[in-house]
Amino acid sequence: MKRTYQPKKRQRKKEHGFVKRMRTTSGRRILKRRRLKGRKRLTA
């Protein structure tokens, strides 16, 4: 059986990227929370 995590840069960006987060209201909320928390990296 293969492992569940098969990393792909494009897929990762498409699912968890900055642009995707900015598109939705909930995504913007996530970014806002991460900024407040002081995260060095906001998205993948």
UniProtKB/Swiss-Prot annotation:
One of its GO terms (cellular component) is ribonucleoprotein complex. Transmembrane segments: none annotated. One of its GO terms (biological process) is translation. Residues 1-23, 29-44 have a biased composition (Basic residues). One of its GO terms (molecular function) is structural constituent of ribosome. Residues 1-44 are annotated as: Disordered. It holds the Pfam family Ribosomal_L34. Keywords: Ribonucleoprotein, Ribosomal protein. The keyword rRNA processing does not apply. HAMAP family: Ribosomal_bL34 (MF_00391). Belongs to the bacterial ribosomal protein bL34 family. This is Large ribosomal subunit protein bL34. It comes from Alkaliphilus metalliredigens (strain QYMF). The lineage of its organism: Bacteria, Bacillati, Bacillota, Clostridia, Peptostreptococcales.
